[in-house]
């Protein structure tokens, strides 16, 4: 009997500082423990901590392949069982076809990213990936105003561009009541 490869798409989403990258790294390390071939990618625009590593806010890290175009993943994925993609919201809509093709080829694809921008508008690529995913994990953070569960990323600067790569100087997590779009 022929062995059927069962690919999947998993999405880890939530606001800034909710542990998305931490969870992605955890799942990939578990894959390594299970003797799976694992690779992680990030958009080259994300150079906050390192060009060569995906790094969580807690400084946990895993070696990665920075790419400018999501289609570059195909160049590295032939012998990979589990593919991680961090900060997925930085990629254009072609990431959807890339993830679907990889999953259809039997790969386990785990993406992590913000589901909404600083105005609470969904990132289009993430919205589509959420619709295509077999497994969704929505994380929360802690509201920096009241201490409640936070699902929003509050921008602290006047910059109006949708994508602003930043940290706690530019963003903080907020609950619905304390969020000011």
Give the ranges of each region predicted by the language model.
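Conserved P-loop
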Residues: 1-77, 117-128, 138-141, 165-180
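Short recognition patches in nucleic-acid-associated and regulatory proteins
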Residues: 142-164
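Walker B catalytic acidic pair
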Residues: 87-88, 113
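Short basic (Lys/Arg) and small-residue
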Residues: 133
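Sensor-1/coupling segment of RecA-like P-loop NTPase cores
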Residues: 102-124
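Catalytic P-loop NTPase motifs of RecA-like helicase/translocase cores
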Residues: 90-92, 118
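Walker B beta-strand of ABC/ABC-like P-loop ATPase nucleotide-binding domains
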Residues: 83-84
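A short acidic, amphipathic alpha-helical/loop segment
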Residues: 27, 93-101, 125
């Amino acid at each position: 009997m022929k062995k059927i490869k069962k690919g999947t798409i998993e999405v880890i989403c939530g606001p800034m500082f909710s542990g998305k990258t931490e969870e992605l790294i955890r799942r990939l390390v578990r894959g390594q423990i299970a003797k799976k071939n694992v690779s992680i990618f990030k958009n080259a625009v994300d150079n906050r901590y390192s060009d060569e590593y995906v790094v969580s806010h807690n400084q946990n890290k895993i070696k990665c392949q920075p790419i400018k175009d999501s289609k570059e993943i195909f160049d590295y994925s032939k012998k990979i069982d589990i593919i991680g993609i961090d900060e997925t919201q930085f990629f254009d809509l072609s990431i959807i076809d890339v993830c679907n093709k990889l999953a259809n080829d039997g790969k386990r694809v785990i993406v992590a990213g913000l589901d909404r921008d600083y105005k609470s508008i969904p990132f289009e690529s993430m919205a589509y990936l959420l619709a295509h995913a077999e497994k969704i994990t929505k994380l929360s953070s802690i509201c920096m105003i009241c201490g409640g569960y936070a699902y929003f990323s509050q921008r602290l600067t006047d910059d109006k561009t949708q994508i602003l790569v930043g940290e706690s100087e530019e963003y903080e997590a907020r609950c619905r009541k304390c969020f000011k779009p």
